[in-house]
Curated annotation (Swiss-Prot):
Keyword NADP: no
Gene: rplD
Transmembrane stretches, start-end: none
Quaternary data: Part of the 50S ribosomal subunit.
PANTHER family, sorted: 50S RIBOSOMAL PROTEIN L4, LARGE RIBOSOMAL SUBUNIT PROTEIN UL4M
SUPFAM superfamilies named in the record: Ribosomal protein L4
Region (Disordered): 51-76
Function text: One of the primary rRNA binding proteins, this protein initially binds near the 5'-end of the 23S rRNA. It is important during the early stages of 50S assembly. It makes multiple contacts with different domains of the 23S rRNA in the assembled 50S subunit and ribosome.
Gene3D superfamilies: 3.40.1370.10
Any GO BP: translation
Disulphide-bonded residues: none
Protein name: Large ribosomal subunit protein uL4
Record keywords, A-Z: Ribonucleoprotein, Ribosomal protein, RNA-binding, rRNA-binding
Length: 206
């Protein structure tokens, strides 16, 4: 069972903290994580790009000049692809880029991403991250205490004070545990997570 330190906001270790083997101690599966990240990014695409073919652009019904005798190249329509304002060859049309990934694969990818943070010693568990008012200095102090640069902060619930305190800090993102995903876990080097958020993750994935 993985054991990490439980810290306060000043960076002082309070005690050891046990993590679930079933969530934070699985064998890291790079392939499944890659598949899930590809799907996440693909599913963000709108797929609304559209261009017109020569059949759809306006104008061009009449032959611009006679076939022979002008000295110019023969043309049949001013909306042929080689003309300015002509149609597009193989014009792109709206489509869905959605990729489906089995639930079991998504769960394994999440466990693998969390386990990789434990393996790399890039996870920090905080006893609490409560703030009465937004204070960027307070978040900066926490980051400095753990020498954290590119950091993902995960809270148990949506916390506007923490979010507002960190949103102007470059390379730092704050999300509630409900919105935690594999892409964000891999994108950021360090994971700072509250004890309550860990409990929620273990409830879902253990």
């Amino acid at each position: 069972m993985p054991i990490v330190g439980l810290f306060n906001k000043e960076g002082q270790k309070i005690t050891d903290f046990e993590l679930s083997d079933k969530v934070f101690g699985v064998e890291v599966n790079q392939y499944v994580m890659h598949q899930v990240v590809v799907a996440l990014l693909a599913n963000k695409r709108q797929g609304t790009q559209s261009a017109k073919t020569r059949a759809e652009v306006s104008g061009g019904g009449i032959k611009p000049w006679r076939q022979k005798g002008t000295g110019r190249a023969r043309q049949g329509s001013i909306r042929s692809p080689q003309w300015i304002h002509g149609g597009v060859v193989f014009a792109v049309k709206p489509r869905s880029y959605r990729i489906s990934v089995p639930k079991s694969a998504r769960r394994l990818a999440m466990k693998s991403a969390l386990s990789s943070k434990v393996e790399e010693n890039q996870i920090v568990v905080l006893e609490s991250l409560e703030m009465d008012t937004p204070k960027t200095k307070e978040v900066v102090k926490i980051l400095d205490a753990f020498e954290a640069k590119k950091t993902l902060i995960v809270t148990a619930e949506s916390n506007q004070n923490v979010y507002k305190s960190a949103r102007n800090i470059q390379g730092v993102s704050v999300i509630p545990v409900n919105n935690l995903n594999v892409y964000d876990l891999l994108k950021f080097d360090k994971l700072i997570i509250t004890k309550d958020a860990v409990s929620k993750i273990e409830e879902v994935y253990a």
